[in-house]
């Protein structure tokens, strides 16, 4: 094979490899304080992030309700609570907007201590819908807790 054809073939292969592999990162973690029994929690309040325009608060509340928890989402948190749920959602643009990362933390309502926390991180090539990411984070938290 002449040198020009070999160089062209290698350049083409390099271009294809560079454009098709990308950074596909998929990471999901959860930690739960060993002294905490998440099964004993009954009433939770999901605190809205000030910049949440994507309805993540509602998704989290719906998923927790489907697990049997009593969940509120209003701006005022009720006085009788077992936990406050906070979250941080990070979004990126890649042709369309997608959620890059979601962190959900279940906190003690009295002192804000994190009882359990989970995180889901998916780059563009492994992106999930917001609902799927909420599911993934909560499933990992409750799996880690043994509930």
Language-model segment annotations:
Residues 24-38, 60-65, 70-71, 121-147:
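C-terminal/domain-edge helix-coil "capping" segments
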Residues 35, 39-87:
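N-terminal segment of the mature soluble domain
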Residues 86-92, 101-102:
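N-terminal post-signal-peptidase region of extra-cytosolic proteins
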Residues 86, 94, 115-131:
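An anionic, turn-rich surface loop/hairpin at beta-sheet edges
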Residues 1-10:
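Bacterial N-terminal signal peptides that target proteins for export
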Residues 96-122:
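Amphipathic beta-strand/beta-sheet edge segments enriched in Tyr/Trp
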Residues 19-22:
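C-terminal motif of bacterial Sec signal peptides marking the signal peptidase cleavage site
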Residues 49-57, 95-97, 124-128:
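Solvent-exposed loop/turn segments connecting transmembrane beta-strands
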């Amino acid at each position: 094979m002449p040198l020009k054809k070999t160089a062209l073939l290698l350049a083409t292969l390099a271009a294809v490899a560079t454009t098709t592999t990308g950074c596909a990162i998929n990471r999901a973690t959860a930690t739960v304080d060993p002294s905490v029994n998440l099964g004993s929690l009954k009433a939770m309040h999901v605190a809205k992030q000030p910049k949440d325009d994507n309805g993540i608060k509602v998704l989290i509340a719906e998923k927790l309700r489907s697990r049997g928890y009593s969940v509120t989402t209003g701006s005022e948190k009720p006085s009788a609570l077992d936990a406050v749920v906070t979250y941080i959602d990070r979004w990126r643009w890649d042709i369309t907007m997608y959620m890059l990362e979601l962190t959900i933390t279940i906190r003690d309502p009295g002192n804000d201590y994190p009882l359990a926390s989970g995180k889901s991180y998916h780059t563009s090539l492994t992106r999930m819908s917001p609902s799927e990411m909420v599911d993934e984070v909560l499933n990992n938290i409750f799996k880690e807790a043994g509930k």
